[in-house]
Amino acid sequence: MTGPTGAAVDGVARLGRVHLLGIGGVGMSGIARLLRGRGVEVSGTDAAPSPTLDRLRELGIRTRVGHDPAHLGDLGAGDTLVVSSAVRATNPELLAARERGVRVLHRSEALAALMAGRAGVAVAGTHGKTTTSSMLAVALTAAGLDPSYAIGGELTGGDDGGARDGSGPFVAEADESDGSFRAYAPVVDVVTNVEPDHLDHYGTAEAFAAAFEEFVDRLQPGGLLVACADDPGSAALAGHARGRGVRVRTYGASATADVRLRDLQPGAAASAVLVDGGVPRELRLAVPGEHNVLNAAAAYCAAVELGADPVAVLEGLARFGGARRRFELKGEAAGVRVVDDYAHHPTEVEALLRAARPVAGGGRVVVVFQPHLVSRTRAFAAEFGRALALADEVVVLDVYVAREDPDPEVTGALVADAVPLPAGRVRFLPDRSAAAGTLAATVRAGDLLLTVGAGDVTTVGPEVLNLLAER
């Protein structure tokens, strides 16, 4: 896999022509859109055709399927190849680019170049990055600040691919999974939480926490850290920042929070009273869950720091309709609602299921969960089991291995066996289509069906809806 190169480029003018490997992914396609919007000649390749590639072509971006050195065209010295950590060092286009003297940048370094010269905001944390980044983009827009943003997910109802280039602050979702979030030098850091993950990369929880300290140390002079007072890891990071003389603003239900949440109602449309500087303000959302109230408070703090009017920010947050694959309603058939969510860490799964309960009302919460990564499944099988026990019925698929190699001893059965529910309420069904058939035959009117995970479990919901519509 290809990690950050350590290269630094001040702005996009020096990038030359840019070719992106894996351009169909949401992060890479967003960078392609932003670069094209700034007049850069952009091309890219991906492993398979997709609607994303079609949309990029409509913007004048040359895209091709498959990885072949010929797809580089006459790219040479002075031009740039952008890669992600998912790109293997043996990729033929990468090898050819290096031979030609093409500059190679990691995705995060390209994003840092786009952020250069703007009031940058980097949103990081083990959970909630995409939703918080999306909320912040919506809030800044509502306040008239015309933000740029690059988010690891699309806003519900939007068609911008999670990326937009405005004239105001630049909001970037900062991915900690490979350590590349240390490439940014923003004026505001938002850290929603710090809970060990990606130990395949970091090795230890201590190394994971240290990476967040390095991330905060990259803040520009006079910059601000927005941190969650309710999360121990984030609170510890706030202490580190204060020790380095960094300004800190905390949020949460904790009595120590600078922006405090009271009377929190985590129902289908969550709400709270947000107290800022002794002034109580009503925070109302159209999305469920305590975790989303916290995400909204983080977005509020960052937006106000950037000069947004607090009232306009809260009005924008009230209109936030969610991000794709974040409690996204996929449809309803035979009285069964299907919601899709990207949750892939035990804490995320627990927060999701707690948020789902009031939405389900008197109906059952049925979840089909796909573990993501062999390393994460091995490390957190027991924790996943405890979180999934909050559902009424559980189906576990096999592991989506993604960038890792399969391990016959690490399957979805590890998670299914760890769910402390009666055997009849937990099933291990490795195949997605078989799981969809079983679910369509067993769900009933009033149920809320959740498809959960960071892999291709998202295809199960539409398949179940089609089967329900036929019966």
Swiss-Prot record:
Pfam families tied to this protein: Mur_ligase, Mur_ligase_C, Mur_ligase_M
Q: Which SUPFAM superfamilies match?
A: MurCD N-terminal domain, MurD-like peptide ligases, catalytic domain, MurD-like peptide ligases, peptide-binding domain
| Alphabetical UniProt keywords | ATP-binding, Cell cycle, Cell division, Cell shape, Cell wall biogenesis/degradation, Cytoplasm, Ligase, Nucleotide-binding, Peptidoglycan synthesis
Output the Gene3D superfamilies linked to this UniProt entry: Mur ligase, C-terminal domain (3.90.190.20), Mur-like, catalytic domain (3.40.1190.10), NAD(P)-binding Rossmann-like Domain (3.40.50.720)
Q: Subcellular location, in the record's words?
A: Cytoplasm
UniProt keyword annotation of Ligase present: yes
Looking at the UniProt entry, the stretches that span the membrane are none
Q: In which pathway does it act?
A: Cell wall biogenesis; peptidoglycan biosynthesis
Which Gene Ontology BP annotations are present? cell division; cell wall organization; peptidoglycan biosynthetic process; regulation of cell shape
CC per GO annotation: cytoplasm
Q: Name the chemical reaction catalysed here.
A: UDP-N-acetyl-alpha-D-muramate + L-alanine + ATP = UDP-N-acetyl-alpha-D-muramoyl-L-alanine + ADP + phosphate + H(+)
UniProt keyword Nuclease present: no
What's the chief localization of this chain? Answer: cytoplasm
What does the entry list as the binding residues for ATP? 125-131
According to the UniProt entry, what is the EC number of this protein? 6.3.2.8
The highest taxon in the source lineage is Bacteria
Report the record's disulfide bonds.
none
InterPro entries, alphabetically?
Mur-like_cat_sf, Mur_ligase_C, Mur_ligase_C_dom_sf, Mur_ligase_cen, Mur_ligase_N, MurCDEF_pg_biosynth, UDP-N-AcMur_Ala_ligase_MurC
In terms of PANTHER family, this protein maps to:
UDP-N-ACETYLMURAMATE--L-ALANINE LIGASE, UDP-N-ACETYLMURAMATE--L-ALANINE LIGASE-RELATED
The function of this protein is: Cell wall formation.
List the protein's name.
UDP-N-acetylmuramate--L-alanine ligase
Q: Record the organism.
A: Kineococcus radiotolerans (strain ATCC BAA-149 / DSM 14245 / SRS30216)
